C-alpha cells in the first residue's frame, strides 16, 4: 500500500494549516465495525465521529480522517473507497464534469441532477417565507442505511451543502462554492439579494425557534415525498469567489453572483480545487501567452520605427523566409560596399575579421620557428613571400568580396566559431615539412630559406622514423592563418591537402629502437646543462637529436650486441629444447599411468568385487591408489631430480604400464571366479558379516597408524589432511571410507586431470 503524506501549507480546510496531513487508511480509522459504505465519503465520516465523540471546535484529531479527497465518483482508486491509501482526484476538475442543474416541476420536489450519474438529490419545493432558505436532504433510497446529514462544524462556516451523494467543500483553496441558480429563483428577490451580499467569511447564524417550527410544519406536509432532515441551512448558498493565499490580487477577488441563465450555460465550472485543467488556470495561462506576444510585438515595432538602417526593411506582412532572405542580402551588400570604400582597414578588429595578421613579422622569429633542440648557432627567420598570390577557384561564396584588393596573406574561407580546445587541436603549426607543402601547392604562402629547411623538416618521414614525437614550438594562435577544417563529433577534420602537419598535444609516439644508453658524449651533467643553457638557447643534446658521434657509437654498440645475442640464442635454444623434451616425456608418462588407474577403478564389473575385497582385505583399493600415487609423485619436482634420470624413469613407467594392463586382465578373471563363489556361498554371508564387523574395528586402528606413518616421508613443514567419515568410529562397516594422505605426498600438476571417482 502506498501512503503519501504531502505538505499542504496554504490550505486552511480543517481549522488551520495541515502540515502533518496524511491520507486516510485502515490504520487510522477506529476499530468499530463499520460498513464500507460508511467509509465512502468524508461527510459520512464526519457524521459518525460527531455521533460517537461529540464535536468540539478546537479538536483537530480527526483531520487525518475527514478527507476531502474521496468520493464514489473517483476513478483513480481501485475500489472507490478511501481506505486504499492512493491519492484520489475526486474534487479536482478536469473540465469534463458538468455543473448540476435543477429540474423543477410545480408541486413536486426540485431535483438536483448531474449528467454524469443517475443519482439525484431532492429539494423541498413549497411556498417559502421571505427569510426561509432552501433545505437539502438525503434521498429516500438511502434513508434507512445512513444518518441524515448534519452541517459540518468548522471554524469558518460558509454554509456548505452536504448531501448523500455530493458535497461542496468549504476550504480556502476552493475556487468556487457552487449552488444551482434556479434554486435561488424559487425564493423572493429580497432573500437572494441578501444572500448574495453576504461575505465569504460570515458564519451561519443559528436558527431561531420560529423558523424551526415553520420548517417542521412545511416538511411534515410533504413527508411522503421528502424525508425529514436533521439540520438545515439558514440561507441559499450562492456561487461566490473564494480567495486563496496564492491568488489574492484585487483582480481575482471580484465576487461572482448567481444568475438565472448560468444553469443553461455550457461553461464547465471547476468543482473544487484550482488545478491544471480548471478555468482559472486556463485564463491565467492565456494571459501569460498574450503578454509574451505583446512584448514581442512591441520589440518588433521599436525595431521598425527606430532602426538606423539606410535601406528600409520590408514590412511585417511578409513571411519569415522573405525576412531572412532580405536580411542576408542587406548584410552582404553592406559588406561589399565597406570593402570597396575602405581600401585601408583602419581598426585592427576589421583587419582581424579579414584574417590580416598585423604582428606576423614580430611573432615569427627565429626562436619560435627554428627547433630549440637543434644544435645550430645561426638561424634566419622565416620570410613571407609577398609576391605570392593565392589563386582561388571562383565560387558563389567567393564572389562577395571579389572587387576588393586582396592582401597576400588573406584567404577567404568561411570562418568557424570554435572553443579554445578545438582551436588548440586544429591550430596550424608553421614548422611543417617542406616535403609536405611543395612550392606549387596553392595553400602554401610561406617560403622557407634553404638554410633552415633541414631544421624545419625534422619531422618528415626520412628523419622521424626512430624518434620521439614531441610537441613542437608554434607562434601565437591569432598570428597564424588557420587551417580550414570541419568539427564533427568534437573532432577536427582538416579540409586542406596537408597544408601543415597537425600534431596532438598528447600524441607521443615512442619507438623502442631509439632507446639506448647515453654515451659519455651525450650524457649531460647538471652544471654543464645550466652553463650551456645560459650561454645559448639551442646548444644542449637530447635523445631526440642525433649527431655524427651518436651514429658511430650506435653502430659499434649494435654490432657487439648482435654478436653476443647470436651466441646466447644458440645455447638457449638447445637448453629449452632439452628441457621441453624431458618435461613432456615425464608428463605424458604420468598421464598414461593415471588414466589406467582411473579406468581400473571405474570398471563396473570390478567395482563390486573391489568393494567386497576392501572389506575383507583391509581396503586394498586405497592402498593400491596410495601406492601408485606415492611411487609416481615421490620426487619433489625439482629440475635436478626430474632431468637426471629421465631415460631410466621413462623406461620404468612404460614397463609399469604394460604390467598394469596385464594386471587388469588377471583381475577381471579373478572377479568372474569370485562372483561364482559368492553365488554359491549366499547362505554363509550373514555369519561372515558379523565376523567382518569385529575385524574391521581392529583393522581401522591399524590403517590409521599405517597411513600416519607415511607423513615422515615428507618434510615436517608439509601439512597432512585426514578426510574421515563421521560414521567411521561409530559404525565400523563404513571404515572403508577413510582417506588419509599427507599433502606433501600427493602432488598435483596443472596438466593432469583433477577429478577422480572413487
From Swiss-Prot:
Keywords: Phosphoprotein. It is found in: Bud neck. Residues 338-348, 355-368, 400-414 have a biased composition (Polar residues). Signal peptide: none annotated. Residues 651-689 have a biased composition (Acidic residues). One of its GO terms (cellular component) is cellular bud neck. This is Altered inheritance of mitochondria protein 44. The keyword Mitochondrion does not apply. It comes from the Eukaryota. Residues 315-330 have a biased composition (Low complexity). The modification Phosphoserine is found at residue 25.
Amino acid at each position: 500500500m502506498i501512503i503519501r503524506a504531502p505538505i499542504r501549507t496554504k490550505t486552511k480546510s480543517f481549522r488551520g494549516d495541515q502540515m502533518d496531513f496524511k491520507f486516510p487508511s485502515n490504520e487510522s480509522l477506529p476499530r468499530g465495525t463499520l460498513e464500507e459504505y460508511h467509509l465512502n465519503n468524508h461527510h459520512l465520516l464526519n457524521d459518525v465521529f460527531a455521533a460517537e465523540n461529540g464535536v468540539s471546535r478546537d479538536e483537530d484529531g480527526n483531520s487525518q480522517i475527514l478527507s476531502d479527497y474521496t468520493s464514489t465518483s473517483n476513478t483513480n482508486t481501485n475500489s472507490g473507497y478511501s481506505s486504499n491509501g492512493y491519492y484520489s482526484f475526486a474534487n479536482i476538475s478536469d473540465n469534463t464534469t458538468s455543473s448540476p442543474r435543477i429540474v423543477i416541476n410545480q408541486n413536486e420536489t426540485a431535483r438536483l441532477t448531474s449528467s454524469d450519474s443517475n443519482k439525484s438529490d431532492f429539494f423541498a419545493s413549497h411556498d417559502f417565507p421571505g427569510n426561509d432558505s432552501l433545505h437539502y436532504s438525503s434521498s429516500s433510497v438511502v434513508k434507512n442505511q445512513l444518518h441524515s446529514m448534519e452541517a459540518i462544524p468548522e471554524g469558518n462556516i460558509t454554509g456548505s451543502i452536504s448531501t448523500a451523494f455530493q458535497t461542496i467543500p468549504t476550504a480556502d483553496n476552493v475556487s468556487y462554492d457552487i449552488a444551482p441558480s434556479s434554486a435561488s429563483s424559487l425564493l423572493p428577490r429580497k432573500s437572494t439579494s441578501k444572500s448574495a451580499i453576504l461575505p465569504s467569511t460570515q458564519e451561519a447564524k443559528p436558527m431561531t425557534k420560529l423558523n424551526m417550527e415553520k420548517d417542521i410544519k412545511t416538511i411534515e406536509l410533504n413527508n411522503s415525498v421528502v424525508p425529514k432532515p436533521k439540520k438545515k441551512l439558514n440561507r441559499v448558498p450562492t456561487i461566490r469567489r473564494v480567495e486563496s493565499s496564492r491568488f489574492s490580487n484585487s483582480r481575482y477577488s471580484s465576487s461572482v453572483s448567481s444568475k438565472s441563465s448560468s444553469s443553461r450555460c455550457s461553461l464547465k465550472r471547476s468543482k473544487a480545487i484550482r488545478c491544471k485543467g480548471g478555468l482559472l488556470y486556463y485564463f491565467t495561462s492565456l494571459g501569460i501567452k498574450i503578454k509574451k506576444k505583446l512584448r514581442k510585438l512591441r520589440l518588433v515595432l521599436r525595431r521598425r520605427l527606430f532602426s538606423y538602417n539606410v535601406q528600409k526593411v520590408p514590412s511585417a506582412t511578409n513571411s519569415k523566409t522573405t525576412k531572412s532572405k532580405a536580411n542576408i542580402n542587406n548584410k552582404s551588400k553592406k559588406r561589399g560596399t565597406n570593402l570597396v570604400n575602405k581600401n585601408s582597414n583602419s581598426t585592427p578588429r576589421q583587419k582581424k575579421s579579414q584574417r590580416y595578421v598585423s604582428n606576423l613579422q614580430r611573432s615569427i622569429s627565429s626562436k619560435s620557428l627554428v627547433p630549440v633542440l637543434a644544435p645550430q648557432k645561426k638561424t634566419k627567420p622565416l620570410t613571407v613571400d609577398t609576391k605570392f598570390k593565392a589563386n582561388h577557384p571562383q565560387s558563389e561564396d567567393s564572389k562577395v568580396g571579389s572587387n576588393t584588393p586582396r592582401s597576400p596573406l588573406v584567404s577567404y574561407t568561411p570562418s568557424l566559431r570554435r572553443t579554445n580546445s578545438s582551436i588548440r587541436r586544429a591550430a596550424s603549426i608553421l614548422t611543417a615539412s617542406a616535403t609536405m607543402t611543395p612550392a606549387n601547392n596553392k595553400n602554401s604562402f610561406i617560403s622557407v630559406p634553404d638554410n633552415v629547411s633541414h631544421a624545419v623538416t625534422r619531422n618528415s618521414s626520412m628523419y622521424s622514423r626512430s624518434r620521439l614525437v614531441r610537441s613542437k614550438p608554434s607562434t601565437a594562435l591569432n598570428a597564424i592563418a588557420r587551417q580550414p577544417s570541419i568539427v564533427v563529433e568534437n573532432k577536427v577534420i582538416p579540409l586542406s591537402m596537408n597544408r601543415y602537419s597537425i600534431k596532438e598535444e598528447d600524441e607521443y609516439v615512442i619507438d623502442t629502437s631509439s632507446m639506448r644508453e647515453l654515451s659519455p658524449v651525450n650524457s649531460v651533467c647538471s652544471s654543464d646543462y645550466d652553463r650551456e643553457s645560459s650561454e645559448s638557447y639551442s646548444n644542449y643534446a637530447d635523445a631526440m637529436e642525433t649527431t655524427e658521434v651518436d651514429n658511430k657509437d650506435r653502430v659499434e654498440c649494435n654490432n657487439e650486441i648482435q654478436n653476443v645475442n647470436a651466441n646466447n640464442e644458440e645455447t638457449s635454444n638447445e637448453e629449452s629444447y632439452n628441457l621441453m623434451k624431458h618435461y613432456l616425456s615425464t608428463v605424458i608418462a604420468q598421464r598414461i599411468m593415471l588414466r589406467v588407474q582411473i579406468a581400473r577403478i571405474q570398471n563396473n564389473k570390478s567395482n563390486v568385487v573391489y568393494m567386497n575385497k576392501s572389506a575383507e582385505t583391509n581396503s586394498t583399493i586405497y592402498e593400491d591408489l596410495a601406492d601408485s600415487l606415492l611411487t609416481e609423485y615421490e620426487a619433489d619436482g625439482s629440475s635436478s631430480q626430474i632431468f637426471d634420470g629421465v631415460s631410466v624413469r621413462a623406461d620404468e613407467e612404460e614397463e609399469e604400464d604394460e604390467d598394469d594392463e596385464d594386471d587388469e586382465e588377471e583381475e577381471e578373471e579373478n572377479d568372474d571366479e569370485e562372483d561364482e563363489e559368492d553365488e554359491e556361498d549366499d547362505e554363509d554371508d550373514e555369519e561372515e558379516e558379523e565376523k567382518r564387523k569385529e575385524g574391521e574395528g581392529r583393522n581401522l586402528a591399524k590403517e590409521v597408524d599405517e597411513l600416519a606413518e607415511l607423513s615422515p616421508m615428507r618434510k615436517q613443514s608439509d601439512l597432512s589432511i585426514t578426510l574421515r567419515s563421521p560414521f567411521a568410529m561409530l559404525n565400523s562397516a563404513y571404515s572403508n571410507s577413510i582417506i588419509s594422505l599427507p599433502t606433501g605426498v600427493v602432488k598435483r600438476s596443472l596438466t593432469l586431470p583433477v577429478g577422480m571417482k572413487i
